[in-house]
């Protein structure tokens, strides 16, 4: 089956400054204790896991104290709260971590190297966003052609999954 992942990068008041991450992960033996908040977590209400940037050190430059953790969204202390948009829709969420225990084996790579991993992932994400915009333009072009050719109504029979429906309508 499918596993839904959420991205835990953005935090309240941080804007696009990922180096200002405040969500803390303190190592205690073979686990981390995570406290903090993420925001604008797209489709987090469906997430089974969240990959998070967390602060594991305050020494040195802000970028050097960030780690990358995988957190089970069903863990005790994880709360997902919807952010209702102006149109009444619910795609994004706030995610709260209150003394969440995360096995140390869920650390990705090395402690305090999360900044490097996140930069790599974001470079691919931004490239893929360009692909989405190109796809939207192509869909609009196909809609015009389908309407012109008189087959637009037939296309309404195609099943479109709920989370992606706004891209097509």
Regions found by a protein language model. Name each.
Residues 31, 35-81:
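A short core secondary-structure module
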Residues 100-114:
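Long, acidic (Asp/Glu-rich), low-complexity accessory segments flanking structured domains
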Residues 158-169:
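Single conserved hydrophobic/aromatic residue that forms the stacking wall/gate
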Residues 120-141:
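A conserved active-site cap/scaffold subdomain adjacent to cofactor or substrate pockets
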